[in-house]
Amino acid sequence: MTLTQEFDTIAAISTPLGEGAIAIVRLSGTDALKIAQSVYKGKNLAQVASHTINYGHIFEEERLVDEVMVSVMRAPKTFTREDIVEINTHGGIAVTQEILQLLLRNGARLAEPGEFTKRAFLNGRIDLAQAESVMDLIRAKTDKAANIAVKQLDGSLSKMINNIRQDILESLAQVEVNIDYPEYDDVETMTSQMLLEKTAHFEQLLENLLSTAKRGKILREGLKTAIIGRPNVGKSSLLNQLLREEKAIVTDIAGTTRDVITEFANIGGVPLELVDTAGIRETDDLVEAIGVERSKKALAEADLVLLVLDASLELTDKDLELLELSKNANRIVLLNKTDLPEKLDINQISGDFIRISALKNENLSAVEEKINQIFFAGEIEAKDATVLSNARHISLVEEALKALKEANNGLALGLPVDLIQVDVTRCWQLLGEITGEAAPDELITQLFSQFCLGK
């Protein structure tokens, strides 16, 4: 266990700035209680029990600033393993900023982004993977993304990585003993075959973990989804239904959407970054033409394409062009306006399609099911499974797996065990970067700088 390190006392507003019922100003450090007491009138905070909430007032000398509730949590049973004080104030920018400035004038330092979580990491409260999951939980756009983050915060990924690293370390230790003390008869010899069996087992464990990466990354980051189609086929109506609110202008006038509209929607637990593109057509309108070019770019960059066709009209040359343009993408063809008589010839469409009415919100559940089928083979989230979702973690597991494969190839070619040790050690070190056991200081600083202030 890492011993708590000595730091100065930091302060920051931990709730979003703006109007609200309450706001929280947080202190952490050796002098947290002393600094809070210097601006607080109520019970003596040095004498109250830990993990209690205490009523009082904040004063600037004799001037009342706010009526507050003050939470006192003593080390080491806190998030940072330091003394923590949280001042619950009335929401609003003026009051919270004034209280923060009072704390800073009385000895606290303004916290850097993510510094509270960084202290939790440095003091051994959480490891690096758990620290990153804190931000993933804050940024989660769906319940399934939040579930993955909570499991990682609880240590599911860390436990798996630590177990694999421990097994690798034991194998490396046995190799070292054989190299350094070959004359000892009572030490089991690690033969090439024995090491190959062990590294093959480690390789399988990492392969299994890596197989969750696609699902995890989608749930964490979302699917970039382009809604395409010629003008006035119902793209904006579809966007509004998926968002469950009116974000795009819906009219009968072609060219109403003159740019690219981007919003996030929760579709069955999958975050979709929906891009409602300008209708792709020839136009003399300069602004609309720019929107059309951006639409084509969005199509090229999309993870998923929703191609909207007007089922109440016959297919046009532009419809056929879009069908051809998107044929190699992860595409769902939507025959919209099924509330009107159908005139579209379905024989002109290759592959599956779904009939919907975006105007009346009919059959959109089938779109959700199709997305699930395309990207998750029908199972979005495996129960109790450890899932890789962070791009940094995925990259490190890929590199660790590559090192193991090189070790296995060397063993298969008959290379000495001591030469193979280099690749196995590299695998062990790479996995250690996930939890922070082997992460360089520069990486740790860079990761925590991405956190929000007050966390």
Swiss-Prot record:
Exhibits a very high intrinsic GTPase hydrolysis rate. Involved in the addition of a carboxymethylaminomethyl (cmnm) group at the wobble position (U34) of certain tRNAs, forming tRNA-cmnm(5)s(2)U34. Belongs to the TRAFAC class TrmE-Era-EngA-EngB-Septin-like GTPase superfamily. TrmE GTPase family. This is tRNA modification GTPase MnmE. GTP binds at residues 232-237, 251-257, 276-279. Mg(2+) binds at residues 236, 257. CDD domains: trmE, TrmE_N. NCBIfam families: mnmE_trmE_thdF, PRK05291.1-3, small_GTP. InterPro entries: G_TrmE, GTP-bd, GTP-bd_TrmE_N, GTPase_MnmE, MnmE_dom2, MnmE_helical, P-loop_NTPase, Small_GTP-bd. The lineage of its organism: Bacteria, Bacillati, Bacillota, Bacilli, Lactobacillales. Its EC number is 3.6.-.-. One of its GO terms (cellular component) is cytosol. Binds 1 potassium ion per subunit. GO terms for molecular function: GTP binding; GTPase activity; metal ion binding.
